[in-house]
C-alpha cells in the first residue's frame, strides 16, 4: 500500500529522520521498515535518512502488508454506522448510546464490527467510549496507520470534548479536576476517586448553561483517558451526570447525558487540521426535557 502527500508550506526544512519521527510521529518499528526497505520516496526518488526535505516536496510512503497482518473480524451491520468523516486512512463515526465500542469476545458484535462492514475491511479501535456514552469516535482503516494514531493519542495530540448535563448549578465558569481514579473495591463495575492508589486523571470543565431546574450543561475536555473519568470526577464533586446508571442511579433521565461532541487533531499523514462536531438526537431530546 502506498500513501502519497505533499509537504505543506507551513513546515520548515528538516531531515527525513526528523520529519518521520517528530512531525508524523511514526513509531520506531515502522520507521525501521521504511528505512531498511527504502520505502520512503521524495519526489519519486529514494532518499537517505539525513537528507533535507522542504515544502512542496512529494512524499511517498510504502507499506508491505506482510509486515502488518490484518486481523480477521466478524462483520456487523453497516446500516448502524453514522459516518462523520472518512478518508484513505481513517474513519470517524457518531456512536449511539447503548452500543459497545468493541466486544469482549471475538464473536461479540459491537460498533467495531459495524464500522468494518461499512468500510468493507477490518478497522481498528483508536480510542473507546463507554457503552452508555454517545458521540464521535475514531477508527483506523488499516494496521499501518493504527500505531501512528495511537502515538498521537499518547502524546495528547488528539483533542476530545464532551457535553454533559449534570445535577446542580455549577458555580464556577471554569473548573479543573485532578483527582486520582482507581477501582471501587465494592463494585467491580465502578471507579472511585482514590488519592492513595489511583491513577492521575485530569478533566477540564467549562459551564455552558445553567437551567432553572438546578441542572447545568457543561463541556469537558480530557487531558488523560481513565475509565469513567468524566463520570467519576463530576460525581465526586457533586455534579453527577443525569441518567448515569452507575453514579446517579436515581436520575429519571432516559439515557446517560454524556456525549462526545467534538474531535480535533492534525491528520498524521496529510498534516491537515481536522475538527468535527456532532450531536445525538436522543441527547438533544433529553436535554430539552431535563434542561
Enumerate the predicted regions with their spans.
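Conserved hydrophobic positions within beta-strands
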Residues: 83, 166, 204-207, 241
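Pseudouridine synthases involved in rRNA/tRNA modification
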Residues: 1-34, 81, 196, 212-215, ...
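Structural detector for hydrophobic anchor residues on beta-strands
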Residues: 162, 177, 201-203, 216-218
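Short coil-to-beta-strand transition motifs
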Residues: 73-78, 194-203, 257-258
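Short polar/acidic secondary-structure junctions
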Residues: 52, 169, 210-212, 268
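RNA pseudouridine synthases
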Residues: 1-176, 180, 185, 286-287
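Short Pro/Gly-enriched beta-strand edge/turn motifs at strand-loop
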Residues: 186-189, 200-202, 243-248
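Well-ordered beta-strand positions
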Residues: 84-85, 130, 182, 206-209, ...
